[in-house]
Each structure stands twice: as C-alpha cells, then as structure tokens.
Curated annotation (Swiss-Prot):
It is found in: Cytoplasm. The keyword Transport does not apply. Catalyzes the attachment of tyrosine to tRNA(Tyr) in a two-step reaction: tyrosine is first activated by ATP to form Tyr-AMP and then transferred to the acceptor end of tRNA(Tyr). It comes from the Bacteria. GO terms for biological process: tyrosyl-tRNA aminoacylation. A motif ('HIGH' region) lies at residues 46-55. Residues 349-416 form the S4 RNA-binding domain. The keyword Cell inner membrane does not apply. This is Tyrosine--tRNA ligase. It comes from Xanthobacter autotrophicus (strain ATCC BAA-1158 / Py2). One of its GO terms (molecular function) is RNA binding.
Length: 416
C-alpha cells in the first residue's frame, strides 16, 4: 500500500515514518482502523526496573495509536516473566521473585506515563492477573489441542537451542503458549484485535492470532516493526557504557541527550521519523543538511527525543550543558588524545582496558571499581556494564570516543 491509499491516520502515520515491517492483513486492518477506534497491545517483560531505548520503537507505536484516536494497551508480563522468554537466549533467564516483578512493573509504569495518557483510553495490564489463575488440566484441554509439538519445534527460540545442543526447559517451552493466550484474554476483556511487536516476535504474535481465531472465532491482526540497529550495526539501546535506560534515576537526561546527539550521520533521518514527532517536511529539511551542519540536525534529534521522555525543560537544559561543555569544537581540539588501531575497535575493545590504555586508571581492576561507583563515562554516558566493549559504533561525529574519569579527567580515543 502507498501513503495515499491508507484510509486510517494510524497506519498512514506508521507507514510514512517507517514503523511497518510485516502485517497479517494490512488492507483489512486499515479498513477496521478507519471505521472507528480499535484496541491494540504490545507485551513487555518485567525483567528489569526500567525499559531502555531498545523498547522505544514499541512505545512510540502505542503513542501513535493513541494520538490517532485509538486505544493502546501496554501489557506487562508479570506472569510470563516468571517463566522467561527463551527467544534469543542461550540459557534460561534468572528467576525473579513475585515482589521483584511487582516492583519492576511499578517502576516501568512511570516510563509509560511519559508517553501515554492513562486517563484517555490507554491501559496497562498485567498478564499475571489471568495467568496466575489458570488451572493446569483445564488449560491443557482448552489450549493444548491448538498447538502441535511439530510446529513448536520450528520456532527459532526452540530450534536454535536444540541445534546448539543447549538445554531448553519444559518451563521455557510453555512460554509461547502462555504468550499466545494473552491475545485471547485481551480480546475477551477489551475487544483487542491487534498485537504489535518487533519482527523477531512475528511467530509468537501469529500464534496468538490463530489461537484467538480457533478459541473465540475472533478476527485478529498481527503487525511488526523492523528490528532496528544503528548504521554501524550496533543494537538500539546499547552503548559502550551499557543500556540506555529510560529512567532518570538510572541515566540522566543529559546522558540520554548525548546518546541521541552521538547518532551516526546515516541514522539521523530515520531516527527523527521514529523517535520524534516533528513534521515530515521539517525532517526532510534537517536530513538534507551536510557537512558540519548535520550536527544541528543531531541536536534537534537529541532535544526532541529527550523532551518526549524527560520534558522540554530537561531537554533544553541538556542541550545547553552540552554546548557549554563542548563549545566551538572543544571536544575534538582541546582534550588529550590517545591513538588506537582501528582494527582494535573493529574487534571490540573491552571498556576497562580502554581506560587503562588511555592512562585514566592504573589497572582493569581499578576500572571495574570505578564502574561500580559510577565514576567512568564513555561519550558522557555512565558505564554500568563491566563487560561492555567499545567498537566503531561508539565513535562520535568527530570520529573519536570520549573517555571520562569523574568530571575533570577526559581523554579521546582516536582510531588510526
């Protein structure tokens, strides 16, 4: 479908801004959304106390859904988190207590409240409210006939573990069944007809769609987004310093602003479409900037993305702090520079070793102590992961990586 043929504002907006990867029936879903408000959901694990930038694509889809007159549901996996999604994992996830999961959900709700209006159609649900109440034999009789072991073994989350001869527990094997059941339950409770998610979740989403059709005769839809990486191949939401958290207690608005300011030139237009609400003609103007002027577009990206999460005042303050710190190219000119072989960054330089090589700490053990105390930063983002590596994706627009110990000691790594 082209932009002109969409009848619904919701899908037209998603299409124009590059959110759509795959849909079970785009034309019929568009017709439904054009007729009146629809209800759609995206599921989120409760494995951490915050979401990170890798979740933003899903959050922005829910926000777009609400802004175009529909009803979003943010489904927290309070029940499924007790099992753990085996997708993309080589081993079983760490088991969390019920209290840890509840605390995580309470914290994550604050993030959603920045993007969704829970008083105007948006809802947050917790699948523990129905999964915890299921009885085993009735579940097997009601849901079991609709799943074949043959098909379940073809899913990547299962197949990859078995091919690698890594254990897959019966607990994890049940994850896809319970995840599919969520769609059935949300359709029954809220008339929900659409599940959205990343393209890696396509099989799980289609499972739920088919289960709803078989159990309830429901007319359901699946829609996925592209799996997003930066132009350097890095995973969204990850930096050399660790995860880019959406919680100001874990990552300051200034550090969040810096994450977006450090976007690669090739990513600017795409990120402006996906992670800001600027008009498309303004985005096209910014994307056309060249040379040093592209840095203005990156500042706009950083400020608009930060304003959505932390508010306009915090975003403007972060921008001014950055300008005061790096006015007139001070970053590239005035700081001591250590050269590293480009091949070293291509292979991935352990962050602790990088600080040793830069002369900022005496040993990797000291670097690890500093990381635990929040004393090290890469490109002005606090390092939280001792095992993080610095690669070419960490290069700033100036072609360097900035390492900081505390507030006053800075060194630039420059690939040669």
């Amino acid at each position: 479908m082209t932009t002109q043929t969409f009848r619904s504002d919701f899908l037209r907006t998603l299409h124009e801004r590059g959110y759509i990867h795959q849909c079970s029936d785009l034309e019929r879903l568009d017709a439904k959304a054009a007729e009146g408000p629809i209800t759609a959901y995206i599921g989120f694990d409760a494995t951490a106390s915050s979401l990170h930038a890798g979740h933003l694509l899903s959050i922005m889809m829910l926000r777009t859904l609400q802004r175009t007159g529909h009803n979003p549901i943010a489904l927290m996996g309070g029940g499924t988190t007790k099992i753990g999604d085996p997708s993309g994992k080589d081993e079983a996830r760490k088991m969390l207590t019920d209290q840890q999961i509840e605390d995580n959900i309470a914290s994550i709700r604050k993030v959603f409240a920045r993007f969704l209006d829970f008083g105007a159609g948006a809802k947050m649900e917790n699948n523990a409210s129905w999964l915890d109440e299921l009885k085993y034999i009735p579940l097997l009789r009601e849901v079991g006939p609709h799943f074949t072991i043959n098909r379940m073994l073809t899913f990547d989350s299962v197949k990859l573990r078995l091919e690698r001869e890594q254990p897959l527990t019966f607990l994890e094997f049940n994850y896809m069944i319970l995840q599919a059941y969520d769609f059935v339950e949300l359709n029954a409770r809220h008339g929900c007809i659409l599940q959205m998610g990343g393209s890696d979740q396509w099989g799980n989403i289609v499972n739920g769609m088919e289960l709803g059709r078989r159990m309830r005769g429901a007319d359901l839809f699946a829609l996925t987004t592209p799996l997003l990486t930066t132009s350097s191949g890095a995973k969204m939401g990850k930096t050399a310093g660790g995860a880019v958290w959406l919680d100001a207690d874990l990552l300051s608005p200034y550090e969040y602003w810096q994450y977006w300011r450090n976007a690669g030139d090739a990513d600017v237009e795409r990120f402006l479409k996906l992670f800001t609400e600027l008009p498309l003609d303004e985005i096209a103007r910014l994307a056309a900037l060249e040379g040093q002027e592209i840095n203005h577009a990156k500042e706009v990206l950083a400020t608009e993305a930060t304003a959505l999460l932390h508010g306009r005042e915090a975003a403007e303050k972060a921008k001014e702090t950055s300008r005061a710190t790096f006015a007139d190219g001070a970053l590239a000119v005035d700081l001591p520079t250590v050269e590293v072989p480009r091949a070293t960054l291509e292979a991935g330089l352990p962050v602790a070793k990088a600080f040793v090589d830069a002369g900022l700490v005496a040993s990797t053990s000291e670097a690890r102590r500093q990381i635990k105390g929040g004393g090290l930063k890469v490109n002005d983002v606090t390092v939280t992961d001792e095992k993080a590596v610095i690669d070419l994706g960490a290069l700033t627009p100036e072609g360097v990586v900035k390492l900081s110990l505390g507030k006053k000691k800075h060194v630039l790594l420059k690939p040669v």
